[in-house]
Structures are given as C-alpha cells and as structure tokens.
From Swiss-Prot:
GO BP term, example: translation
Keywords from the named record: Ribonucleoprotein, Ribosomal protein
Pfam families, per the entry: Ribosomal_S21
Bias-annotated ranges (Basic and acidic residues): 31-42
Protein name per the record: Small ribosomal subunit protein bS21
InterPro entries (alphabetical): Ribosomal_bS21, Ribosomal_bS21_CS, Ribosomal_bS21_sf
Keyword hit for Ribosomal protein: yes
Family under the similarity heading: Belongs to the bacterial ribosomal protein bS21 family.
Annotated region described as Disordered, given as residue ranges: 30-58
Biased composition, class Basic residues, residue ranges: 43-58
Listed NCBIfam families: S21p
Single GO cellular component term: ribonucleoprotein complex
MF (Gene Ontology): structural constituent of ribosome
Length: 58
C-alpha cells in the first residue's frame, strides 16, 4: 500500500499529487484493473502470446 507523510508547510494538493505519483509508480491502479474480474489461466496465456506476437511484428 502506498503511504506518504504530509510534510511541514506542504499543501494538501501537493501531498495528493505526490501520493498519486507514488501509486502510479507502484502500479496500484493497473493491478486493480487487472484483478477487477477473474481471468482464467488459459485466457491469460492467450493474451500473453498475442501481446508477444504484436511486439514481434511491430
């Protein structure tokens, strides 16, 4: 879990911006989207191979 401490003389907007940046770096939102619905292992493998194919031909 991302956690920040609000520094002295730091506005709420600055702290919120810092928190959002930290969450983005940690990949929290992408992980939440990925886990939103269960995905069968066979579907995961299929998506992974399709992504590899796209990268290869790009």
């Amino acid at each position: 879990m991302s956690e920040i401490r609000v520094k002295e003389n730091e506005s709420l907007e600055q702290a919120l911006r810092r928190f959002k940046r930290q969450c983005a770096r940690a990949g929290v939102l992408s992980e939440v989207r990925k886990r939103e619905h269960y995905e069968k292992p066979s579907v995961k493998r299929k998506k992974k191979s399709e992504a590899a194919r796209k990268r290869k031909f790009k």
